[in-house]
Amino acid sequence: MPAMLLGAMLAAQALDAPSGKVVLTLTGLISEGNQGKTKAEFDMAMLEKLPQHRLKTRTPWHEEVREYTGPRLRDVLAAVKSSGKTIRAIALNDYVVEIPMEDIEKYDVIVARLANGRPMTIREKGPLFIMYPFDSSETLQSPLYYGRAAWQLKAIEIR
């Protein structure tokens, strides 16, 4: 299914309020919130309801190839009807990185919730990890893109 069509379908659905523990908060340039118009909270079940994608890749943080599973970042952003040019990904340790929307459209970046089929603990860089398909392009195998792969993701601000 073309990404734009999927995005339109996701954007057409109202965003439910989380019923479990909030694992991701989106703020900024969004028009479909569930905590007021410009704030959206997701629990793990909400992220699981989005189309799930798997990618196998090497990272600088692990010796072996790992398989990551989660929704595409573009689908998460479509669910809140985002309209910005960049996002700021914020980790549990307050690490912040800016990611241009061009990355999100060009590459199949996911919000990984599983590594090798298992939920990730905080110690394992979870529970959420922005993951690029590093092995799909030599361009992505650089400090610039490795730095954009935010682990222990807790929030996204759309600008």
Where would I find each of the regions flagged by the language model?
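N-terminal intrinsically disordered, low-complexity segments enriched in P/E/S/T
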Residues: 13-159
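Bacterial N-terminal signal peptides
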Residues: 2-9
